[in-house]
């Protein structure tokens, strides 16, 4: 009998991107990824052919026959000079070498306005004025000694600015100093009499009295040297804290709070003691009606009253303060 063996199909060898020495068992060329420093993208690979003596099983027979001779003749440092094979790889961003639309617009704007975006070294924009050029030529032709032969000119004296002193500001020319003022000297007395009013002033006052703007009765009181203007303090309006400005309402804080009103006599509202006593009695009676004795389901003896399980409550009972 003949024994039939099932023929197995060899699997395709995986292609790695790492650089390895060509294996004797592998007949497929390796693909090695690299980063070129000449601006080429990463999606470029180079084929390393298999050994020359082995049978070629790859479709890239051209490179397998031709490249090994170059590798054998050249040294290890010359392998990078071999020809590169570029493969098209999907989903790779295309390198854009053209300028963008905004870059083109900016370049056109600079060209139209004659503006140099990045001027070269050693160049500058000079103001070429004919007047300045003529003046420079005349000055260059005029000989000027380096060291002056004559005496140096006198420095012009600057006029000192006017300083504002106390004598210029005030009318009196008394010397001011930082000495302590002597208060032992009494001030000059206040004048007891004033000059009589003039005729035009009297005529004006009589007209105002006829129209009723000024009252006809005026008390001509003599002025006092100590208090020369007593009417100034009499006509001053009293403050709101005084009794004449109190509101005809009872102060709520005075009748409700146990400590009375905190403002005292300066309060704007009235402080009625009778109303306060009546209100305090109502508050105390409402407290007595709302208070209930605490009933507990557990009875504690006098011995265990101060131990665990006993809870002290703050009572509003009128007998608690006794």
From Swiss-Prot:
Keywords: Metal-binding, Zinc, Zinc-finger
Compositional bias (Basic and acidic residues): 34-49
Zn-finger (C3H1-type) residues: 245-274
GO molecular function, one term: zinc ion binding
Top-level lineage group: Eukaryota
Name assigned to this protein: Uncharacterized protein C50C3.1
Stored InterPro entries: Znf-CCCH_4 (IPR041367), Znf_CCCH (IPR000571)
Residue ranges with Basic residues bias: 309-322
Organism field: Caenorhabditis elegans
Pfam families (alphabetical): zf-CCCH_4
Keyword match Metal-binding: yes
Annotated spans, Disordered: 1-63, 278-322
């Amino acid at each position: 009998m003949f024994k039939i063996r099932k023929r197995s199909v060899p699997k395709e060898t995986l292609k790695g991107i790492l650089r390895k020495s060509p294996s004797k068992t592998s007949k497929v060329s390796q693909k090695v990824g690299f980063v070129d420093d000449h601006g080429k993208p990463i999606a470029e690979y180079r084929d390393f052919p298999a050994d020359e003596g082995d049978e070629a099983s790859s479709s890239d027979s051209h490179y397998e026959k031709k490249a090994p001779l170059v590798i054998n003749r050249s040294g290890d440092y010359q392998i990078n000079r071999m020809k590169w094979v570029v493969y098209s790889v999907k989903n790779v961003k295309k390198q854009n070498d053209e300028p963008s639309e905004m870059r083109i617009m900016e370049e056109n704007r600079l060209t139209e306005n004659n503006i140099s975006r990045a001027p070269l070294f050693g160049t500058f924009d000079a103001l070429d004025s004919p007047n300045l050029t003529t003046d420079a030529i005349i000055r260059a032709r005029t000989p000027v000694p380096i060291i002056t032969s004559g005496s140096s000119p006198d420095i012009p004296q600057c006029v000192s600015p006017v300083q504002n002193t106390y004598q210029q500001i005030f009318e009196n020319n008394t010397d001011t100093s930082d000495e302590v003022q002597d208060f032992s000297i009494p001030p000059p007395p206040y004048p007891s009499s004033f000059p009589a009013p003039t005729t035009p002033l009297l005529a004006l006052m009589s007209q105002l009295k006829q129209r009723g703007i000024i009252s006809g009765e005026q008390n001509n009181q003599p002025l006092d040297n100590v208090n020369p203007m007593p009417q100034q303090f009499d006509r001053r309006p009293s403050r709101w804290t005084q009794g004449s400005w109190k509101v005809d309402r009872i102060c709520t804080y005075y009748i409700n709070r146990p400590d009375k009103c905190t403002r005292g006599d300066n309060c704007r509202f009235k402080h009625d003691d009778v109303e306060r006593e009546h209100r305090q009695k109502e508050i105390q009676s409402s407290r007595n009606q709302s208070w209930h004795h605490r009933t507990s389901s557990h009875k504690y003896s006098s011995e265990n009253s101060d131990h665990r399980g006993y809870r002290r409550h703050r009572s509003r009972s009128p007998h608690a303060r006794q």
